């Protein structure tokens, strides 16, 4: 009886593991990040995290990461950095191909901006934006700064919520949602900066 019972138990455990694997694969398929043909990330991974753990975990993780990264006292904006040189070269190549360019500064939800301020880097952030602005002026390009303290950037955070509809514009401080992206595109394409 022991051997027969052991075989039945082994079979049941194998069936259970197979079923669990199948469920895991199905769930993963629906909640992985996916880029559309035009490069849009639909944020499906965020849906899963918010439903299971709430927005708080995303915000806490980003805040810890930012605080650690911005603690480096050597962080200084350099006009002659390789980053600015690469931007200039890239813009030159686009100009040679007659490709129209619009520059923008990403929106950051207020907790991100708070970490910049608390790290004593607000001046460096403003200097970086000034240098980007100088590049835009030099090349006669449009520049939109979505990081300013607007109604959207300062929108209250529903940290404890597990309902993805509660934070309409951001998944976490550095990643904005499609709603925000659509408003940004409207602003850049047709000059419509109105919040609907």
Where are these regions (language model features)?
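Long, contiguous hydrophobic alpha-helical segments, chiefly transmembrane helices and signal peptides
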Residues: 103-108, 112, 128, 170, ...
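Active-site segments of SGNH/GDSL-like serine hydrolases
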Residues: 94-119, 145, 151
């Amino acid at each position: 009886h022991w051997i027969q019972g052991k075989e039945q138990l082994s079979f049941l455990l194998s069936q259970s593991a197979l079923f669990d694997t199948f469920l895991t694969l199905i769930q993963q398929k629906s909640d992985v990040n996916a880029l559309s043909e035009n490069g849009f990330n639909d944020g499906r991974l965020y849906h899963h995290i918010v439903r299971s753990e709430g927005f708080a975990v995303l915000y806490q993780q980003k805040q810890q990461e930012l605080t650690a990264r911005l603690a480096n006292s050597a962080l200084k904006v350099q006009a002659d950095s390789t980053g600015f040189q690469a931007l200039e070269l890239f813009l030159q190549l686009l100009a040679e191909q007659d490709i129209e360019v619009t520059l923008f500064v990403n929106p950051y939800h207020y907790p991100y901006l708070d970490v910049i301020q608390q790290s004593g880097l607000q001046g460096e952030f403003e200097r970086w934006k000034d240098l980007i602005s100088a590049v835009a002026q030099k090349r006669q390009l449009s520049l939109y700064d979505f990081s300013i303290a607007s109604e959207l950037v300062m929108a209250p955070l529903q940290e404890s919520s597990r309902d993805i509809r509660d934070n309409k514009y951001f998944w976490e401080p550095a990643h904005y949602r499609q709603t925000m992206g659509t408003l940004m595109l409207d602003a850049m394409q047709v000059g419509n900066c109105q919040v609907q």
